[in-house]
Amino acid sequence: MELFLPSVLLILTVFCFYYLFKPKQTQNAPLPPGHVHWPLKIFETFDYMFKAKTNSIHKFIAERRNKYNTKLFKTSHIGQNMVFLCSPEGNKFLFANDYKLVRSWWPVTFLRVFENAEEEITPEQVIRARKQFLSFFNEPEALAKHVSITDEVVKDHVKLFWDGSDEVTVYPIARKLTFAISCRLLADIRDREILDELLPAMGDVVAAFFALPINLPGTKFNRAVKGSRKCRKIFVDIIKQRKIDLFEKGRKEANDVLSNILLENHRDGIEVNEVALAKNLVSLLSAAFDNPSVTIVSIMKNLAENPEIYARVRSEQLEIAKGRAPGENLAMEDLKKMKFSMNVLSESLRLEAPASGTFREALNDFTYEGYLIPKGWKVHWSTHATHRNPQYFKDPEKFDPARFERNDPIVPYSYVPFGGGHHICPGKDFAKLQILIFIHHVVKKFNWEKVNPDEQMIRVPNLKAAKGLPVRLYPYNK
């Protein structure tokens, strides 16, 4: 009994201090509805994985949005307590609060694979490098130059992998194409042996973004780490040779990111950290080649399933071809005329955006829609929350490129295939450019049909055609 009263007083004191000093703005805010604890978190994870394999993540989101009748919910995803935002307003809120309430977040696998290059250079050098990358892929004058180079690469690719073939599997050769384009513009890599050495290693890197970070022989993560190191070594060698070519042999060409960065830094008297630059180039390459190749697969699938839409695309491209002499490269003004082809691209991105979305981390406790999002929790915006939601897109499961040429207004932030805010995809215009050029050349030469009529797109976890999309080709020049 002697200890009872002091114990009660101690407990009361602790509770008083807790409620007295608890942050006022969130003290009454509940967590979003959902499940993050055992054993229900296991069911959440497996349900997400199952729906991803059938390319129906939108159903995972819709079921919880409807169940809780909210614009957000909490769940356990990739080992994290995570809040899913389910509305255009949520997308806008998140994009507008980068570096204020949230910051970009990536799974630990991603960071370990790339061995963060930013740790080796100053913040000023990080900002400078990003500006150099962005200007090369975003400025109109630079993009106009890329059209002719990309056109050359696409024509060579079609001649090598498509001409004379009765059947092709689209995914692997589309990857070869977008990889060749990316390597050409990033570092002027044209040697097919180097491309053939880099591509499998980069494929291992991309395949492991969401793998378990277990570095044992034979695991995805182990292959990704080895692949990343191999690519960095190749790029360091390329950087060293390029410096010799530019500053000792007087090379004049500078139509790639690497040469422009080296020349600009040399002009300003800045010594380049070769390892850090190689890491940045590998990271940029991983983002540049995979998603456009998946979108090419999606477009090929959608055109095979919709012959009347294919006919409109071909008619548009043949009309554009009439304005060019045989063998003459396309120019930016030609791409601006590809209005219906652009609608096909946009609709393919709506239905099957290669990236499901990205992640943010809460910098501090904050509230949204009356719910508390605690510091350190992860927040996920997803294309699946709005792209296939009938509230924002009529007949959302229907492939209907005409929806982008009608006067029906698209709700702001409901169509977000490239994200938004400070972290919007920096290469979005370049990605569209290379896909449109590919469409131009392939529809001029071929019609095609799916070898497996029921083949669909799946996510494991990256988007891909279930069997790589083999197609039978019907060339027009036979």
Curated annotation (Swiss-Prot):
Pathway participation:
Secondary metabolite biosynthesis; terpenoid biosynthesis
Describe, from its UniProt entry, the tissues in which this protein is expressed. Answer: Mainly expressed in petioles and, to a lower extent, in roots.
Which amino acid positions bind heme, per UniProt? Answer: 425
Instruction: List the membrane topology term(s).
Output: Single-pass membrane protein
Where in or outside the cell it occurs: the entry states: Membrane
Cofactor field: heme
Please cite one Gene Ontology biological process associated with this protein.
sterol metabolic process
Q: Which InterPro entries has this protein been placed in? A: Cyt_P450 (IPR001128), Cyt_P450_CS (IPR017972), Cyt_P450_E_grp-I (IPR002401), Cyt_P450_sf (IPR036396)
List membrane-spanning regions.
1-21
Q: Which GO terms describe its cellular component?
A: membrane
Query: Which EC number(s) does UniProt give?
Result: 1.14.14.-
Q: Which UniProt keywords apply?
A: Iron, Membrane, Metal-binding, Oxidoreductase, Transmembrane, Transmembrane helix
* MF term (GO), any: heme binding
Top enzyme class, one word, equals: oxidoreductase
Catalytic function, reaction form? (1S,3bR,4R,5aR,9aR,9bR,11aS)-1-[(4R)-5-[(2S)-3,3-dimethyloxiran-2-yl]-1,4-dihydroxybutan-2-yl]-3b,6,6,9a,11a-pentamethyl-7-oxo-1H,2H,3bH,4H,5H,5aH,6H,7H,9aH,9bH,10H,11H,11aH-cyclopenta[a]phenanthren-4-yl acetate + reduced [NADPH--hemoprotein reductase] + O2 = (1S,3bR,4R,5aR,9aR,9bR,11aS)-1-(1-hydroxy-4-oxobutan-2-yl)-3b,6,6,9a,11a-pentamethyl-7-oxo-1H,2H,3bH,4H,5H,5aH,6H,7H,9aH,9bH,10H,11H,11aH-cyclopenta[a]phenanthren-4-yl acetate + 2-methylpropanoate + oxidized [NADPH--hemoprotein reductase] + H2O + 2 H(+)
Q: Which domain of life is it from?
A: Eukaryota
What biological function has been recorded for the protein in this entry?
Answer: Monooxygenase involved in the biosynthesis of limonoids triterpene natural products such as azadirachtin, an antifeedant widely used as bioinsecticide, and possessing many medicinal applications including anti-tumoral, anti-malarial, anti-rheumatic, antibacterial, anti-inflammatory, anti-pyretic and diuretic effects. Catalyzes the formation of (1S,3bR,4R,5aR,9aR,9bR,11aS)-1-(1-hydroxy-4-oxobutan-2-yl)-3b,6,6,9a,11a-pentamethyl-7-oxo-1H,2H,3bH,4H,5H,5aH,6H,7H,9aH,9bH,10H,11H,11aH-cyclopenta[a]phenanthren-4-yl acetate.
Q: Which family is this sequence assigned to? A: Belongs to the cytochrome P450 family.
**What is the protein name for this chain?**
Cytochrome P450 family 716 subfamily AD polypeptide 4
Q: Which organism's genome codes for this protein? A: Melia azedarach
